[in-house]
Design a protein with these regions (language model features):
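Short loop/turn segments that flank or connect secondary-structure elements
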Residues: 1-205
Length: 205
């Protein structure tokens, strides 16, 4: 890991020639590409589907520190992402999940702030050039997105801490409610952040 931390306006060496001829980060990722509500909102509205529809073959549920979360599903003999097309290119590139956009960067949450770091040797392309972090992420209104990520990170941590001290029945209730409010309930095409805030209030109410 590069010890340096970056913000949205910093330049970092991540450009990789548009991943020409390479799909290494779309293969053999196991359960690591965890999806947040923003990712689900993007997938549902751009693919005209539902969470249940995505669960049929593109995503799956797994447990992370006691909390049930969806992730992209690897499949086939090459163990690749289900959204990889016949040309071995991302079929959802314009609305790909946040962790896919991020790579080869990582996120560091500290004292209510979000910074980025470079994962050394994570990308196999050897001649990377510099790009501004916010351009690399390519998400409209980066500050709003970061505020969402911080709130989501804090909620997950809070729930995972709570789960560690709860009975099996309580853990089941937490997970069922969490999944229903933030994932299973259909997202509208309207402003995601407004919908997320409403769901946060409902969950904590």
């Amino acid at each position: 890991m590069d010890a340096k931390l970056y913000n949205l306006n910093d330049m970092v060496r991540v450009n990789c020639n548009d991943c020409q001829g390479c799909f290494s980060c779309c293969q053999g990722m196991g359960e690591s590409i965890v999806l947040d509500p923003y990712d689900i909102w993007q997938l549902e509205n751009n693919l005209n589907t539902t969470f249940a529809g995505l669960m049929q073959e593109k995503i799956e549920l797994n447990i992370e520190n006691g909390l049930i979360l969806p992730n992209l599903k690897m499949c086939g003999t090459l163990d690749t992402c289900g959204f990889l097309n016949e040309d071995r290119r991302c079929g959802i590139h314009k609305f790909r999940p946040g962790l896919c956009r991020l790579f080869p960067l990582g996120r560091k949450y500290e004292s209510g702030e979000l910074r980025y770091f470079l994962l050394e040797d994570a990308c196999t392309y050897s001649a990377q050039t510099k790009a501004k972090v916010k351009k690399w992420l390519d998400i409209a209104d980066g500050r709003k997105y970061e505020n969402f990520l911080i709130a989501w990170h804090d909620l997950r941590k809070e729930l995972q801490d709570k789960i560690g001290n709860s009975s099996d029945e309580a853990v089941k209730e937490i997970n069922l409610r969490f999944l229903h409010i933030f994932y299973e309930k259909q997202y509208l095409a309207d402003d995601f952040y407004v919908q997320f805030e409403e769901r946060m209030k409902r969950f904590k109410g």
